[in-house]
Amino acid sequence: MAKKKKQKTIKLDAEIKGILFITIGVLSLISIMSSSNSGIIGKMSKKILVFIFGLGAFIFPFFIIFVGVCLILKKGKVTYSGKFYGIVLFILNTLFCLHIGDIVTKGLDRSFFQGIVDIYNSETFLHGGVISYIVDLPLYKLFGKWGTFVIFISIYVICFILISQISLYSIISKFKLKKEKRRKEKNIEIKEDVQDEVKFTEIKDSEEIPEEKIINRIKIIDFIKNTNIEENDDTKENKPIQKGKDSNNIQGEKDINKELEEEMSKAALKTIDYEFPSIDLLNDNKSIKLKKEDKKELLNNANKLEETLTSFGVEAKVTQVTKGPSVTRFELQPSVGVKVSKIVHLADDIALNLAAQDVRIEAPIPGKSAVGIEVPNRELTPVYLKEVLDSNEFKNCNKNLAFAIGKDIAGNCVVSDLSKMPHLLIAGATGSGKSVCINTLIISLIYKYSPEDVKLLMVDPKVVELNIYNDIPHLLIPVVTEPKKAAGALYWAVNEMTRRYKLFAETNVRNIESYNELLKKGKGVEKLPLIVIVIDELADLMMVCPNDIEDYIGRLAQMARAAGMHLVIATQRPSVDVITGVIKANIPSRISFAVSSQIDSRTILDMGGAEKLLGKGDMLFYPSGESKPMRVQGAFISEEEVEKVVGFIKEKQCGEVEYEDSIIDEINTSIEINNEDRDELLEEAIKIVVDVDQASTSLLQRKLRIGYNRAARIMDQMEERGIISQKDGSKPRQVLISKDDIV
């Protein structure tokens, strides 16, 4: 109670003081404005105020009223800022300047007291009062006229700093930046087909960014590049699938198509009758470049990022902002002594301050002394397959199995060579972009290679994904949709691999490239095409016949590269029971789309990160030989575009497609054998008889610990498969295969 009573008393005292100050101020104002009606006290107060302050007497009443109002509003707790003291000093300095003229005019002949008397008897207001006289006279005697003016000017500069709260350093820096900008604007020549760059100084008028941050220079790169570029003669001399850079000139496109047709006709003389599809069958990208508002937003986010890190004690500067199709990467330059791990641990705090869905940190960026912070864009910009196929990266790629992947964050087209991988594993959740990626790979091969150079063996347990490619000349056999037939197709692939190695041994060559070179030298050998085996859903195959599929894939992955056979395996369930150790160890190149958990990401990439991807083609591309995966926005191709390309190929081919009947017969034979009552111990029994090089029912009974009837059935099954010889009286059966023949 006592405390409340004391607080109430303090409040009342402050209000009383405030009212007294306001009253004195109003009376002073009346006395100065109208001395005839202000009484004796009014006339005296006017004389005293004019004597003390001179012209400042008109300001003094307002100052007293202001103090009174502050006492009432602030409850007696009045504190004055630097701006207040700056205003008071400005008024006093103005009075000093006003009065120095009187001292200069009358000189130093009169005495000090005579000067005070002259001020008191003065009938004009145009002087600074006795206060100004007491200050100006010593200054004038010590420093003279010009020295006194220099002091007054310095005081005005101090007043400006106190009132505006702006440092002289920032003003000078701002002037330098403006001068530098004008100089650069005179020297910069505007060009097309360059990455869009802007300096931080371009938005100096923005209220959202502090002026102190303007000193930092941030480079902004937009991944969308201008495509209105004239073609030169070098870009026109390419393969049939290649066209020059995009142009709005229709006549130019017609000329390109004519050249493409001429080159395709030349290629047809050397190969089978195959007409390459036109690039015009694919859709154009109509995305627009960055707007000025988008650039300002990126720079504001860069500023927020620096402030967030500073608040956690991490000193770092943003040196470059790169806007990609799906994410924007902020490149940070940490100060000396800052641990990279400290920045990585702040991922959630950075996402919170930038209002981002999620943040992925790449520390450090390969090849740069910087840390990359990848923030998702508000709107995802698609990358169309036509852009990548029409790029110099794809057109100038002379690899055996070049295919388009997409664009990286900087907007560079990513093209890879399947023959160097040599096998590819693709994983991602439903809807993340796996099927589109497979279509992109297949269409890329169709655009760049003829059926004589590349053959495709497709396995599609989902039935609906790859059936559209039936009846194109690149296929060895129709798309395989039954899981058991898929095992038979892989079994044929293993046999084909073995056959090719035998051919290599006979001709003393080591790989398919050397073997096909013999044909160019005039030696009578058959040309062996490269074979790409595409499996769209591995998980479904592993559920039906896991042992066979794993064994076949493992054998192909280990040995098929030199034979010109390459695997592309996709699955939406990257778990350890689908991507087994054997498969994972032999397929070093991986593409991971968005997955549901970090465990799945580690299964496919051996590291986290895929769980933070955005879907819709956002991927981590991890080719063999690289230390870290690369973030890429996958090229998009619609079903309509696939239908156009496939329809064009079917329309232009002569006659019906001739499939390899021998492959189909071999697959059907293996299916018939597998459809019988196959014992689950058959494989183990085969290994036993091959190891001991003899086969008998009693041997299987002892080794497998089974009864006579089951052992006899296993013996019959091995006989049907040609593993052991037929029964010949009392003679022991012969084992017809060796350890090398076991698949």
UniProtKB/Swiss-Prot annotation:
<dbReference type="InterPro" id="IPR041027">
    <property type="entry name" value="FtsK_alpha"/>
</dbReference>
<dbReference type="GO" id="GO:0051301">
    <property type="term" value="P:cell division"/>
</dbReference>
<dbReference type="InterPro" id="IPR036388">
    <property type="entry name" value="WH-like_DNA-bd_sf"/>
</dbReference>
<keyword id="KW-0132">Cell division</keyword>
<protein>
    <recommendedName>
        <fullName>DNA translocase FtsK</fullName>
    </recommendedName>
</protein>
<keyword id="KW-0159">Chromosome partition</keyword>
<keyword id="KW-0067">ATP-binding</keyword>
<feature type="topological domain" description="Cytoplasmic">
    <location>
        <begin position="167"/>
        <end position="743"/>
    </location>
</feature>
<feature type="transmembrane region" description="Helical">
    <location>
        <begin position="48"/>
        <end position="68"/>
    </location>
</feature>
<feature type="transmembrane region" description="Helical">
    <location>
        <begin position="146"/>
        <end position="166"/>
    </location>
</feature>
<keyword id="KW-0238">DNA-binding</keyword>
<comment type="subunit">
    <text>Homohexamer. Forms a ring that surrounds DNA.</text>
</comment>
<dbReference type="InterPro" id="IPR018541">
    <property type="entry name" value="Ftsk_gamma"/>
</dbReference>
<dbReference type="GO" id="GO:0007059">
    <property type="term" value="P:chromosome segregation"/>
</dbReference>
<feature type="transmembrane region" description="Helical">
    <location>
        <begin position="14"/>
        <end position="34"/>
    </location>
</feature>
<keyword id="KW-0547">Nucleotide-binding</keyword>
<keyword id="KW-0472">Membrane</keyword>
<dbReference type="GO" id="GO:0016887">
    <property type="term" value="F:ATP hydrolysis activity"/>
</dbReference>
<keyword id="KW-0131">Cell cycle</keyword>
<dbReference type="Pfam" id="PF01580">
    <property type="entry name" value="FtsK_SpoIIIE"/>
</dbReference>
<dbReference type="GO" id="GO:0005524">
    <property type="term" value="F:ATP binding"/>
</dbReference>
<feature type="transmembrane region" description="Helical">
    <location>
        <begin position="124"/>
        <end position="144"/>
    </location>
</feature>
<comment type="function">
    <text>Essential cell division protein that coordinates cell division and chromosome segregation. The N-terminus is involved in assembly of the cell-division machinery. The C-terminus functions as a DNA motor that moves dsDNA in an ATP-dependent manner towards the dif recombination site, which is located within the replication terminus region. Required for activation of the Xer recombinase, allowing activation of chromosome unlinking by recombination.</text>
</comment>
<keyword id="KW-1133">Transmembrane helix</keyword>
<dbReference type="InterPro" id="IPR002543">
    <property type="entry name" value="FtsK_dom"/>
</dbReference>
<dbReference type="Pfam" id="PF17854">
    <property type="entry name" value="FtsK_alpha"/>
</dbReference>
<keyword id="KW-1003">Cell membrane</keyword>
<dbReference type="Pfam" id="PF09397">
    <property type="entry name" value="FtsK_gamma"/>
</dbReference>
<feature type="binding site">
    <location>
        <begin position="431"/>
        <end position="436"/>
    </location>
    <ligand>
        <name>ATP</name>
    </ligand>
</feature>
<dbReference type="InterPro" id="IPR036390">
    <property type="entry name" value="WH_DNA-bd_sf"/>
</dbReference>
<feature type="transmembrane region" description="Helical">
    <location>
        <begin position="84"/>
        <end position="104"/>
    </location>
</feature>
<dbReference type="GO" id="GO:0005886">
    <property type="term" value="C:plasma membrane"/>
</dbReference>
<dbReference type="InterPro" id="IPR027417">
    <property type="entry name" value="P-loop_NTPase"/>
</dbReference>
<dbReference type="InterPro" id="IPR050206">
    <property type="entry name" value="FtsK/SpoIIIE/SftA"/>
</dbReference>
<keyword id="KW-0812">Transmembrane</keyword>
<dbReference type="GO" id="GO:0003677">
    <property type="term" value="F:DNA binding"/>
</dbReference>
<feature type="domain" description="FtsK">
    <location>
        <begin position="411"/>
        <end position="602"/>
    </location>
</feature>
<comment type="similarity">
    <text>Belongs to the FtsK/SpoIIIE/SftA family.</text>
</comment>
<dbReference type="InterPro" id="IPR003593">
    <property type="entry name" value="AAA+_ATPase"/>
</dbReference>
